[in-house]
From Swiss-Prot:
This is Cytochrome b6. The 4 large subunits of the cytochrome b6-f complex are cytochrome b6, subunit IV (17 kDa polypeptide, PetD), cytochrome f and the Rieske protein, while the 4 small subunits are PetG, PetL, PetM and PetN. The complex functions as a dimer. Heme b 2 binds at residues 86, 187. Keywords: Chloroplast, Electron transport, Heme, Iron, Membrane, Metal-binding, Photosynthesis, Plastid, Thylakoid, Transmembrane, Transmembrane helix, Transport. The chain crosses the membrane at residues 32-52, 90-110, 116-136, 186-206. PANTHER family: CYTOCHROME B. It is found in: Plastid, Chloroplast thylakoid membrane. Component of the cytochrome b6-f complex, which mediates electron transfer between photosystem II (PSII) and photosystem I (PSI), cyclic electron flow around PSI, and state transitions. Belongs to the cytochrome b family. PetB subfamily. Heme b 1 binds at residues 100, 202. It comes from Chaetosphaeridium globosum (Charophycean green alga). Binds 2 heme b groups non-covalently with two histidine residues as axial ligands. Binds one heme group covalently by a single cysteine link with no axial amino acid ligand. This heme was named heme ci. SUPFAM superfamilies: Transmembrane di-heme cytochromes.
């Protein structure tokens, strides 16, 4: 085993990477509230894992979506647990994100030179809310259907381009299969990809600039 490690160490300098990660200075004023961002990230990882598991059984059609969710809850082994964990971690992610934003704002973590870290954080908060909006519709029950109808109808109040935006969101004039397909694609591919990219940027900037000092 040692020879295998030495082979990789010679080529990748694993120990140097490990030392860099583990030797980062942590300011003495840091407390448990500075862990809120990490908890948000952990919730996102749980979301990805549990959501991926459900894609094996969920069917994104207006005729089968609700039945497939019922199948996950009643027939799939531990399906009820996976979906429940997905729902609980979603709530946890939103709550921890809100608390994280308050912590950063109250401790001045958005000030120079960390403005871009704050901007990426705001973008991540918008993406998180978008997860909630798109995911809420996927069971395609009465609550999900009317939530989508209301949310996608809001831009209709925008002058000139309102109706175009509504049609773009819904995929047609009315809410239907095209809407569900769009929301499913956003929820399972577009939003996770964008979130992963902005999280990486967020973490790299924190890594580069360090944790902000006390007020």
């Amino acid at each position: 085993m040692g020879k295998v490690y030495d082979w990789f160490e010679e080529r990748l300098e694993i120990q140097a990477i490990a030392d860099d990660i583990s030797s980062k200075y942590v300011p003495p004023h840091v407390n448990i509230f500075y862990c809120l961002g990490g908890i948000t990230f952990t919730s996102f990882v749980i979301q990805v894992a549990s959501g991926f598991a459900m894609t094996f059984y969920y069917r994104p059609t207006v005729t089968e979506a609700f039945a497939s969710v019922q199948y996950i809850m009643t027939e799939v082994n531990f399906g009820w647990l996976i979906r429940s964990v997905h729902r609980w971690s979603a709530s946890m992610m939103v709550l921890m994100m809100i608390l994280h934003i308050f912590r950063v704002y109250l401790t001045g973590g958005f000030k120079k030179p960390r403005e871009l870290t704050w901007v990426t954080g705001v973008i991540l908060s918008v993406l998180t809310v978008s997860f909630g909006v798109t995911g809420y519709s996927l069971p395609w029950d009465q609550v999900g259907y009317w939530a989508v109808k209301i949310v996608t109808g809001v831009p209709d109040a925008i002058p000139v381009i309102g109706s175009t935006v509504v049609e773009l969101l819904r995929g047609s004039v009315s809410v239907g299969q095209s809407t569900l397909t769009r929301f499913y694609s956003l929820h399972t591919f577009v939003l996770p990809l964008l979130t992963a990219v902005f999280m990486l940027m967020h973490f790299l900037m924190i890594r580069k600039q360090g944790i902000s000092g006390p007020l």
